[in-house]
Amino acid sequence: MGCMCIAMAPRTLLLLIGCQLVFGFNEPLNIVSHLNDDWFLFGDSRSDCTYVENNGHPKLDWLDLDPKLCNSGRISAKSGNSLFRSFHFIDFYNYSGEGDQVIFYEGVNFSPSHGFKCLAYGDNKRWMGNKARFYARVYEKMAQYRSLSFVNVSYAYGGNAKPTSICKDKTLTLNNPTFISKESNYVDYYYESEANFTLQGCDEFIVPLCVFNGHSKGSSSDPANKYYTDSQSYYNMDTGVLYGFNSTLDVGNTVQNPGLDLTCRYLALTPGNYKAVSLEYLLSLPSKAICLRKPKSFMPVQVVDSRWNSTRQSDNMTAVACQLPYCFFRNTSADYSGGTHDVHHGDFHFRQLLSGLLYNVSCIAQQGAFVYNNVSSSWPAYGYGHCPTAANIGYMAPVCIYDPLPVILLGVLLGIAVLIIVFLMFYFMTDSGVRLHEA
């Protein structure tokens, strides 16, 4: 067979090259893109076309987003902000948007470089864990809903104590959840307190449920000067379902025993009437919620890694949060390196990654975006849209429904290849027999 290949090389070279082209065609691209015009992007300064500065830089040079998309109406972005930052802190931007295919390129504006801690001897790593859990919930839910926005949550508290701000660090002040001060008629924090709140107007709500995980010491107004173990819960008064957890760590808020900080879980709650209950220490309850509306057929979100140049410390919490099957993560292998604006804005590789938003593709999958829906040498994993060699892959089930056109095309190509090989074998065998007879 090897000798035959050598003899056939001039005639079979084109056939072999043709097969190579067919089976190396339509590779997945490392971009974020969309199947149609029903898409939306949540971002920060790298996609904020409204940001204004007067420092002599070229207009829009801070963008990773192509400026052609500035007037698309499909972008909600704010310089210096993020969904997580707006959710928890006074520094708020009213993110809102709707689409079938949702893309996130934000998160870096709350990172280890900010070093936020709730208390003087708190733990920023606890906040990185909060960030990961927050985005995991957001990504999971936005694979099932079209619309995301923020809403305020009002509450009714029967006591005399007022809200207090106990989580402040540098420029950030926490206001979600809200903490209720100790009632003046109690000498310590060993008492049960509660407040009612109502969630209405959305299909689901993402709210924080947080505790100070460790041993909290009472304030200077607490004569008992004791340590307390935080315990918080939300009770759905309509369904009877209780959500809650307690402090579990043996840490405090002192130089000798640091680490006490807020640990949050992010609940997806249905509309209804709720009661927030604290069995010890400070009562907390949500003041803001992410409003989820308009359920849709399952469509994974796409998340672009949001990080600084290596001169500033970043985290990988959006990558931790972005898990299959509800999320596809996109990144580059190089350090983020900005151009004319500064090192943190205008990276060439991230601009290439976001350039996929300029056009539609046929298929979005774990490996990337497939431009065409005919054939590919890479099988789309968790593919959505009209994917090469296969149509939609169902949720949680890697079983493909074959698209007949690519299969027929492959069959035709295979049939032609077999016929050509048989013809060439017959031709050379006949030619060899004639020459042998003449010899």
Swiss-Prot record:
Its EC number is 3.1.1.53. GO terms for biological process: fusion of virus membrane with host plasma membrane. Glycans are attached at N94, N152, N196, N246, N309, N316, N331, N360, N374. Residues 12-132 are annotated as: Esterase domain 1. It catalyses: N-acetyl-9-O-acetylneuraminate + H2O = N-acetylneuraminate + acetate + H(+); N-acetyl-4-O-acetylneuraminate + H2O = N-acetylneuraminate + acetate + H(+). Homodimer; disulfide-linked. Forms a complex with the M protein in the pre-Golgi. Associates then with S-M complex to form a ternary complex S-M-HE. This is Hemagglutinin-esterase. It comes from Murine coronavirus (strain S).
